[in-house]
Structures are given as C-alpha cells and as structure tokens.
Amino acid sequence: MSRVCDITGASKSFGNKVSHSNRKTKRSYLVNLHNVTLVSEVLGRKFRVKVASRTLRTIDYKGGLDLYLLNTSSRKLTEVARKIKRKIKVAIATGKSKQSDNI
C-alpha cells in the first residue's frame, strides 16, 4: 500500500532536519493522504480514491472533480485521473452527461 495520491501522484519527498546549531540530518516528508469518495456530476458516478489534502482543497476550489480534471494539464495527472478525464470528455462530447448544461 503505497502512500501516493491517486489524482496528482504526490509522494514522499526528502529534505533536511536542521537543528539550532545548524546541523543537518536527512529526513522524509510524508503526504497527508485521505481515502475519499469523489463524485463526478457529468458521469453521475462516484470514485473511491486516495487523495492528498492539498489536492482535495484544490478540487474544492476549482468547483468539483469534473472541472478540476478538465482544467488541469494531463501531464500533472496520474493514469487513473487521465482515464476519468477521458470518460468525462467523451460524455460531454456525446451529450450523455448527467449535467451537460453546467459545463
């Protein structure tokens, strides 16, 4: 069970712990992950994903999962997120979306 965000791919990073005397020791920073259920309004589906808190705040700020994925570059998304994004684009293009008038 890896500690990686399913949407952005954010994972453990490394740095230094610096003491008062300025000694530096290696340390790692873990991602604050949460198991959440995100709803796609266009597809009318729920997706159970492991998401970083930072990503979750960004999704809320952008207006939901659909708008976040459509307005984010595919290079910044994981393969799981790219598949969801493709399904959303196809649903909008074919007119089979649950709420096509909102986007």
Swiss-Prot record:
Pfam families, sorted: Ribosomal_L28
Keyword Ribosomal protein: yes
Keyword Ribosomal protein in annotation: yes
GO biological process annotation, one example: translation
Domain of life: Bacteria
Keyword set, alphabetical order: Ribonucleoprotein, Ribosomal protein
GO terms for cellular component: ribonucleoprotein complex; ribosome
Gene Ontology MF term list: structural constituent of ribosome
SUPFAM superfamilies, sorted: L28p-like
Matches recorded under PANTHER family: 39S RIBOSOMAL PROTEIN L28, MITOCHONDRIAL (PTHR13528), LARGE RIBOSOMAL SUBUNIT PROTEIN BL28M (PTHR13528:SF2)
Family listed: Belongs to the bacterial ribosomal protein bL28 family.
HAMAP family cross-referenced by the UniProt entry: Ribosomal_bL28 (MF_00373)
Protein name: Large ribosomal subunit protein bL28
Organism: Anaplasma phagocytophilum (strain HZ)
The gene coding this protein: rpmB
